Amino acid sequence: MGEAGAGAGASGGPEASPEAEVVKLLPFLAPGARADLQAAAVRHVLALTGCGPGRALLAGQAALLQALMELAPASAPARDAARALVNLAADPGLHETLLAADPGLPARLMGRALDPQWPWAEEAAAALANLSREPAPCAALMAALAAAEPADSGLERLVRALCTPGYNARAPLHYLAPLLSNLSQRPAARAFLLDPDRCVVQRLLPLTQYPDSSVRRGGVVGTLRNCCFEHRHHEWLLGPEVDILPFLLLPLAGPEDFSEEEMERLPVDLQYLPPDKQREPDADIRKMLVEAIMLLTATAPGRQQVRDQGAYLILRELHSWEPEPDVRTACEKLIQVLIGDEPERGMENLLEVQVPEDVEQQLQQLDCREQEQLERELAPEPWVERATPT
């Protein structure tokens, strides 16, 4: 990589170690360095993040990580530096090393992601979305958010940025949604999201239909699904204050023409949909929507509310249309819950049922056999694997 200038001064004498070569880049990354040399140095760093050994080499370099964060925002090197951090954070095996080298990295990335003037805020959000998939970095990020001013918490700022069109005119901030989904795996984040006085869930619901980004839709649906694990909030989620179910069902609905009797059983927002109504195109998002509804059926009152709002009708048509076997299987399980008999007394809350160890093992074996069957069904088809953004 001659263009990066990384080998300058390396000719003659014993060959320098890779770590020493990386250290030589630091003067070119400092504020005030010649623009062309700075750009070449950052391009070299970005190239190194394209392979495992390169990422491992960079992850432990605290000074280099800090230098990447401090590049001037308007420069092209800052863009490449932000992308290098996205690639570093995409490697779960390096998260511990990254945090050890730079414990303040999550907080600084969050500051960049939520700065409405920062041009590379989307890259900062993507790096955080990658980093927060693992428990330790996620906990560090939650601590950084909790350290924000009580009147304007970090989570509130995150939700506001996600839900405000044009919050940053130069960055779409779609990756704030998967970041929020990762954070919502933690009880403290769910407590914030489900606080009735904050109206956070209500602000997120319209984004389940966001047309311009599957990343944003998927992150929001993942967040809502995680909130549905809190069965003590199901009555509130399904009730008139939130009315979550139509927002989960609408992306699963197609252009089917129901009878008048069936139409009356559906929520108003799902009645008389246009003939060009399209279902959610992403199979992973469809599966999360089905899983969220399944969680809402964990209690007897929840099951009754889901039944009363005609969910079975939407799921019946989804099952007939669904091309993906794993989504179809999830749909079948939910339909069985809705049309099956109620559990015996004392077993009404499915999330609190204690499953004997031998039964749990049998269920795991059944799941394995189910997965093998799905793989056999898929085998003859020449599926093209979708690229996953880093």
From Swiss-Prot:
Belongs to the HGH1 family. It holds the Pfam family DUF384. Residues 371-390 are annotated as: Disordered. InterPro entries: ARM-like, ARM-type_fold, Hgh1, Protein_HGH1_C, Protein_HGH1_N. It comes from the Eukaryota. The modification N-acetylglycine is found at G2. This is Protein HGH1 homolog. PANTHER family: PROTEIN HGH1 HOMOLOG. The modification Phosphoserine is found at S17, S214. The modification Phosphothreonine is found at T388. The keyword rRNA processing does not apply. Keywords: Acetylation, Phosphoprotein.
